[in-house]
Curated annotation (Swiss-Prot):
Component of the 30S ribosomal translation pre-initiation complex which assembles on the 30S ribosome in the order IF-2 and IF-3, IF-1 and N-formylmethionyl-tRNA(fMet); mRNA recruitment can occur at any time during PIC assembly. One of its GO terms (cellular component) is cytosol. Pfam families: eIF-1a. Keywords: Cytoplasm, Initiation factor, Protein biosynthesis, RNA-binding, rRNA-binding. Residues 1-73 form the S1-like domain. It comes from Acidothermus cellulolyticus (strain ATCC 43068 / DSM 8971 / 11B). This is Translation initiation factor IF-1. Belongs to the IF-1 family. Disulfide bonds: none annotated. Its main location: cytoplasm. InterPro entries: NA-bd_OB-fold, RNA-binding_domain_S1_IF1, S1_domain, TIF_IF1. It is found in: Cytoplasm.
Amino acid sequence: MAKKDGVIEIEGQVIEPLPNAMFRVELANGHKVLAHISGKMRMHYIRILPGDRVVVELSPYDLNRGRIVYRYR
């Protein structure tokens, strides 16, 4: 599996669902980012609803887009 060099993991809360499995997420520091679901979450049919607390991976190159990698229970 590929190593995750330089990714930033941060907690956030889903604000609204968008088309094509995209979500608007408000991060713990107050920023709002556009995030999509990671492939493994999609494969295991993990549903994400507004209000869910999630972990988002951000690339250091584009801090406005991210990938949702975990949903808290």
